[in-house]
Amino acid sequence: MMVDFFIAYRPLFDLFLLHTGYALGQYVVLRSGTFSIANAGLTAIGAYLAASLTVKLGLPVPVSILLGTLVSILVSMLLAWPLARLRGVYQAIATLAFVQVVLSLNIYAERLTGGAMGLSGIPKAVGTWTLLISAVVAIYLVACLNRSRIGRAFDAIRQDEAVAVSLGVAISRYQLLAFALSGALAGFFGSLEAFHVYSLEPNQFGFPFLVAALSYVVLGGRHSVWGPVVGTAVLVALPEVSRPLADYRMLVYGLLLILVINYMPRGIVDTWIDYRKNRRRVRSSEQQEKAPL
């Protein structure tokens, strides 16, 4: 029974693992106070480059994945330099333009990417266990990052840049690091997806992908590392759960996001953490009041 259940929902579980990596990449850059949505473009770079190196040049899959990840890191660091001069909505517009440039290159660079027809004939060298191990390691590394001096610097920059500067935090340096880490996650998991799905299409990393990666973090929460994981689980499972609604599934998707943003603006996980802290605080104060003098 359990085996049949796992076989039936294995593609959904694989999708969850891949998108957990994408959500973590988006989470890292947002936590540093940078409103970047460039991860869709960085993911496309990692996926297409890794697949092309193996399909066109015959490189081994691990080497292609490594090179796809490294190039995504390099591009993300080059992108961070001009973005350091921008803030807020201007960062979002600039990174959206970057994504559009990458998607256009995917269509017009036919020799490398296969053009509008996409890239096919990719060997399926990445299975569920590889995705699971990669996702678990990524969660662990991001959790360690949050507890480190780098994570505290990210928090300071996000909350108030002026205060962060007064504390000696080099904003440009830490935002560059955030872009590099985000690019590493995007490029690595993009490369894994390339060797998991047999083929790539230009629209695979387009606007819906961009919105999904951002929604995972907004829905789950932007403070705890479990925020993007929970957000990914909810939104990946939602189409399957709401399948009986047929054409109304996207309506349910949108309404859920609206409700969470209105009533849980900090996200599901962060709201739950705040609730638990408040409960403990109230319980502690009640015990102190009942304690004999």
Regions found by a protein language model. Name each.
Residues 1-293:
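Transmembrane alpha-helices and adjacent helix-loop boundaries
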